[in-house]
Amino acid sequence: KELLDKAHSMDMHILLDLVPGHTSDTHPWFQEAKKAKKSEFSDRYIFTNCVWEAPSEYRLMCGICERDGNYLVNYFSSQPALNYGFYNVTHPQWQLAHDSDGAKATAEALKDVMRHWLDFGVDGFRVDMADSLVKNDDEKIATSAIWKDVRNMMDKNYPEAALVATLKEPSKTAASIWTFTLTTPETATHVFSDFLKTARI
């Protein structure tokens, strides 16, 4: 809080690094999700329906949870993927649709995290891999819908807050994920040009 107050007193803004695609495997949500007993966190991450189900097209950590299933990771074994659902469901035994209750609950949890930090005083977020939330979403249709909902929430309650995206496929997704303050060289030019008009350098 002291850092925020000092930065704001100097007309500076602070953006937090937001990683919405996964958590640590030590996160309390995941500690509950990997238990055999069902809970509100059982669908927060992507688990197969049994330990023998391990499709080769996904990065899965196998046979290490109390729960009968393997969990999907985004990159490393310590990064269980949060479950925003699948746009194209190919394994209905364990994949949730992007508009299912479980997937929607994850998107709401993301907004809760953002609201917490915006209420604390941060000025926005740099969003890591913003176009990789919903799985099997090649055209980023469902992922874009999540960010449009987030942007609507921010415009209503935090209109000065910024979202800066990093994208896995910027040439493919920058046009569709239009809710970010910065996504392309063109938007960056406009934002920084506006800043330079009033900045004290």
Q: What are the functions of these language-model segments?
A:
Residues K1-E2, M12, L18-P28, M129-S144:
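Aromatic-lined carbohydrate-binding/catalytic grooves of carbohydrate-active enzymes
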Residues D25-S132, A145-I201:
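Alpha-amylase-like alpha-glycosidases and glucanotransferases acting on alpha-linked glucans and related
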